[in-house]
């Protein structure tokens, strides 16, 4: 599968010819869009060219979504985009980031996923990259995962029962009690910690190749397809072979001593790099949060250095390990057994 992302892919002149070329080479084609410029007419050429699926972000209720997207009216336009695409015959899906602004709105997002006939819902944690790098208070703290994951497991079960694929992203994990449920479609459910350079690659607009489209450009480009064959970049580039060729010495901090180190390999490379400047130590791990919690501890990330302002930029954070103090937990899952209705 080839997924066209942006910016907005449909703003590129002749982008439907790219879709046709993808389909002519025997690959399926999906599009991820912000959903802000999609009219009733615009999905029709995409459907005719062969776009099979369109994914639109829904990041909470109207106020939260518009705040996160920094665009008044973005929520209404995103929902309209889902409706327009379905009318054109394109299957639709929703993707959502999870952070402290929408942590308690996941049930409401799930209702919209069902109401708009979506075939899938991808979930990932907000990472401090791009605009999010400038708003550290929006991020979840690692200890929030202890209470978040049971909610995700309940929603996964409820939507799966209604034939909606709930797809936790590569930075939602790892090795906790719900991992097999989340990754049941994989041959090895615990092999989903990072797909970069293993089952995924990213092609930037200028032809640069990365193991994952989310990774920063600096340090993670393995070559350019204008200069080298894609297969040569894939096989020979150190940047793309990083997760394929596991070396225990690359792991550090908690991940370096973890029981699951060899299988997990430090979790999502993008998340760790965006937080700490290098991969190999990822505090956003369910097993890790549970391990600390059982010992009366928790981890907190604190921004040390602001982002530079460049594309794919990120700041730097420190990890603080501290005792769990009495504090109001964020609102627990209020509906542990409530079924979502269409």
Regions found by a protein language model. Give the residues of each.
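Short, P/G- and charge-enriched loop/turn segments at secondary-structure junctions
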Residues: 185-190, 244
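C-terminal accessory region of radical SAM enzymes
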Residues: 143-182, 208, 213-259, 265
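Short, small/polar residue-rich loop motifs at catalytic or cofactor-binding pockets
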Residues: 194-198
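Radical SAM/AdoMet-radical enzyme domain recognition
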Residues: 1-144
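Residues that scaffold the ATP/ADP-binding catalytic core of kinase and kinase-like folds
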Residues: 41, 64, 68, 212, ...
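Radical SAM enzyme core and accessory elements
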Residues: 163, 204-212, 217-221, 225, ...
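Short, surface-exposed amphipathic charged segments that create phosphate/polyanion-binding patches used
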Residues: 138-139, 181-186
